[in-house]
Amino acid sequence: MALKKVTLADKYDLTQDRIFVTGYQALVRMCLVQKERDRRAGLNTAGYITGYRGSPLGGLDYQFQRAESALKPNDIFFQPGLNEDLAATALWGSQQAELRGEGKFDGVFGIWYGKGPGVDRSGDVFRHANFAGTSKHGGVLALMGEDHTAES
């Protein structure tokens, strides 16, 4: 019996049914899967991932940067924030991009990541974004890695 050919690129190849990934890589793949689900539903969406590189989830940015060749052709963009507050504000803006029907995309799905103190800092943005909601074909996943002593 011949062994199956496996490459490092398999983790982001949606035609592969069995892959081995880390948790961070699973989040990257999740964005590719969301884009494909939207495409099959007749939607032209984009992805926007942002957060604070100093968070306990700091390895997440590294995975998104490494996967740029798979993400960019699928209109999925990673842009680190200067801090959690600015990243959250930018992501909130992505949910308003097609508010009046003038956007380039039908919607933008997004991920925000930060640490506990950054969640505190970003309370205003979270509150207002929660009241405003997401775009019809968008959505946001907020991830927080705890850092009780704010040392990361």
Region annotations inferred by a language model:
Residues 1-152:
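Thiamine diphosphate
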